[in-house]
């Protein structure tokens, strides 16, 4: 699911390819504009970051570009999840209302299954993914919750320069370092076993060049690695689901989100006592202002300022509690103002859906379950 809900590596590769192809750097803003009001500095030319020349028009490999979805049409296909809530002041009933329709790619069998779990604290019902003992979007006697993708920029690609005298080493801020490697045997039914060697740098695992078209933007004598929050060996995201099912108040629900790592989500909450809230959950990488591609293209992995400096604290994530309007909604849209001090993403969802949702929500003084279905 985390791989389905992130596309920032695709965007980095696409921006780098455009930078190589365009004679006019300003053309990038026409073809891949930043979100209105983003205030992002102009990018350096991708080729200027490296001493070795890259082809201006590199041909993409013929093998499937996506390792898990070989028939995918290509990058840039946004999801369309929606979540919205209303307080009792804006509802015909005496309680708060919450609706959610999380969207993922079409698959067979289906990803989502409706289930009811009986806990010591009471029953919980909602959407589950087989194999995960939690309700990811649903309700208990005390609380309802839903999710939309936050589009958090949780991936960075890094160009790792190989030691020309020893290809088992790569360049770091402190000199050459050995790749961390292991060998795995893949058993093939009806065929011969396949042995692969995996390699890691300090930034993350090394990716095969045919994946995500990264070979087209990898300089000669280099490989590409990936830093991604979902690869954390301390991923406690499942704890958020377990805590939500036992939560009894808005405060309990917000606190549960602190355990979440990836994929980043906007958690929408509505409580039995009529309160509503929304919090972005998921670890947000801490990047330096001196990052030479601003996380919009692959960066040089041996430059210390390009590397992640850890993760921001949970309380810094965008949060909205009991708005005066009595209405909350999210359609993967931008959730922070331009002066928000941290980098969340360069690629928010579209504005059409949130505009329509806002219009529909404000068209009524009070809402019902039926109006939410509309």
Residue ranges and their predicted role:
Residues 20, 34-38, 56, 233-234, ...:
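Ordered core of a single globular domain
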Residues 50, 214-239, 244:
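Conserved, charged catalytic cores of large soluble enzymes
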Residues 13-15, 94-95, 106-110, 115, ...:
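Short helix/loop capping segments that flank catalytic or ligand/cofactor-binding pockets
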Residues 207-210, 216, 222, 262-364:
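Hydrophobic alpha-helical segments
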Residues 104-117, 159, 238, 247, ...:
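Short active-site loop/helix that positions an aromatic residue
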Residues 121-201, 242-246, 302, 358:
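Compact, glycine/acidic-enriched structural inserts
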């Amino acid at each position: 699911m985390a791989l389905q809900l992130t596309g920032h590596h695709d965007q980095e590769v696409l921006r780098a390819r455009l930078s190589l192809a365009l004679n006019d750097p300003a053309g990038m803003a026409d073809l891949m504009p930043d979100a209105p009001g983003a205030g992002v500095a102009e990018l350096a030319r991708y080729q200027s970051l490296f001493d070795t020349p890259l082809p201006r028009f590199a041909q993409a490999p013929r093998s499937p570009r996506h390792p898990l979805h070989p028939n995918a049409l290509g990058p840039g296909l946004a999801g369309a999840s929606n979540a919205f809530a209303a307080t009792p002041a804006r509802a015909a009933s005496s309680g708060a209302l919450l609706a959610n329709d999380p969207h993922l790619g079409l698959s067979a069998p289906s990803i989502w299954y409706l289930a009811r779990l009986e806990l010591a604290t009471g029953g919980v019902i909602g959407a589950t993914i087989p194999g995960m003992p939690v309700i990811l979007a649903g309700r208990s006697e005390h609380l309802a919750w839903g999710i939309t993708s936050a589009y958090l920029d949780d991936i960075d690609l890094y160009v790792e320069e190989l030691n020309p005298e020893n290809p088992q080493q790569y360049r770091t801020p402190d000199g050459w370092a050995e790749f961390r490697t292991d060998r795995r045997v893949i058993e093939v039914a009806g065929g011969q076993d396949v042995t692969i060697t995996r390699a890691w740098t300090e930034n993350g695992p090394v990716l095969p060049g045919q994946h995500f078209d990264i070979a087209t933007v990898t300089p000669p004598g280099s490989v590409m690695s990936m830093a991604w929050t979902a690869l954390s060996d301390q991923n406690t995201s499942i704890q958020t689901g377990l805590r939500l099912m036992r939560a009894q108040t808005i405060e309990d629900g917000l606190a549960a989100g602190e355990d979440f790592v990836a994929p980043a989500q906007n958690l929408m909450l509505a409580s039995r006592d009529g309160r509503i809230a929304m919090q972005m959950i998921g670890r947000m990488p801490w990047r330096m202002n001196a990052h030479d591609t601003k996380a919009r293209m692959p960066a040089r992995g041996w430059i210390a300022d390009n590397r992640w400096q850890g993760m921001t604290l949970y309380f810094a994530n965008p949060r909205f509690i009991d708005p005066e309007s009595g209405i909350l909604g999210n359609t993967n849209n931008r959730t922070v103002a331009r002066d928000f001090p941290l980098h969340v993403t360069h690629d928010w969802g579209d504005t059409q859906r949130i505009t329509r949702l806002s219009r529909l929500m404000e068209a009524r003084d009070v809402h019902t379950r039926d109006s939410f279905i509309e």
